[in-house]
């Protein structure tokens, strides 16, 4: 399958499934010679202004982006553009970043979780899936063994 995308965006959050998705994106971007962007969203509570100094969250974001840059290096991808954003909610921020930067493809990692007996994407991935205009690939983490019954 030939990848038509020239610009790929991967939202990251520091969780293992997010790192695996990013690693996969690095491999795809390297082979396709595509631009790769990573974004970490700091969700700022409504009680604070978006410009508030939330040093713990900023430090966490910097650590996550440093880890993402290390993964890109391990995967021999050069030219990663990684940054963090401040927003009220991650989903709308990722969609806006995708639109503003004219992304062709989003690769979104999601955890394996079941809610009410059904697999659930979670609110952020669901928002992105329903609102982004470019192509999207979901990378769900592997189910635990054995898979819980649906009873």
Q: Over which residues does each language-model region extend?
A:
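Short, flexible loop segments at boundaries between secondary-structure elements
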Residues: 134-146
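Acidic, proline/glycine-rich short linear motifs
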Residues: 39-63, 83, 146-151
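Short secondary-structure boundary segments
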Residues: 40, 109-111, 140-141
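Short, solvent-exposed amphipathic alpha-helices that sit
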Residues: 24, 57-70, 93
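Glycine-rich, Arg-bearing micro-motifs that act as flexible, cationic patches
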Residues: 108-131, 145-148
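Small/aliphatic-rich secondary-structure junction motif
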Residues: 2-51, 74-75, 80, 131
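Short, well-ordered secondary-structure micro-motifs
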Residues: 21, 48-51, 92-95, 118-119, ...
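Structural beta-alpha unit
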Residues: 1-3, 73-106, 126, 146-151
